[in-house]
Amino acid sequence: MGKDMHRPGQLDQIAAAFDVVLIDCPGREGAVVRAALMVADLVLIPCGASPADAWALQQSLDLIEEARGLRPDLAVRVVITRRRATNLGKNARNDLAACGVPLLGVELAERVAYQLAMGEGRGVTTMTGQPDAVREIRDLADAVDALLTENHDAASSVAHVA
């Protein structure tokens, strides 16, 4: 799909063909991001664990608020990434909670394993000797699955009432 994924109807066709579609978008405004927000059931916003990252998060939050004008039930979670074992990293959850968007219960630590996996062109869950990174990614997948299931069940309940 690439840069042409915002063609009218294209995302709707793909979404209709699969149970789950993951769309990795740039963290800035643009036609691709706007198109993805119009079909998304869940938006995950990765955010580093520093004050500068929290400040940069605001642009994404502004775009999501705009999308919620048309999609008021759009589910959004901030995922803390690159969290270090420092006081700054430990306080990131409280600091980011002030942004007003619910945080996902899973955080991804700053790990060499993620960089190695990317450099090798594979997922960290296929690597040996990286149990902490594998656990984090599996926990992330479980949390996303639970949110999608919760949102699907809520939508089904609304559909049955109507």
In which residue ranges do the predicted regions lie?
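P-loop/Walker-type NTP enzyme "switch/lid" segment
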Residues: M1-I23, G27, R34, Q58, ...
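Conserved C-terminal guanine-recognition region of P-loop GTPase G domains, centered on the G4
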Residues: L57-D73, T81
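Inter-motif core of Ras-like GTPase G domains
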Residues: E29-P51
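Short, structured loop/turn "capping" segments at alpha-beta junctions
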Residues: A67-V76, T86, L103
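NTP-binding/hydrolysis catalytic cores, primarily Walker-type P-loop NTPases
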Residues: V124-A162
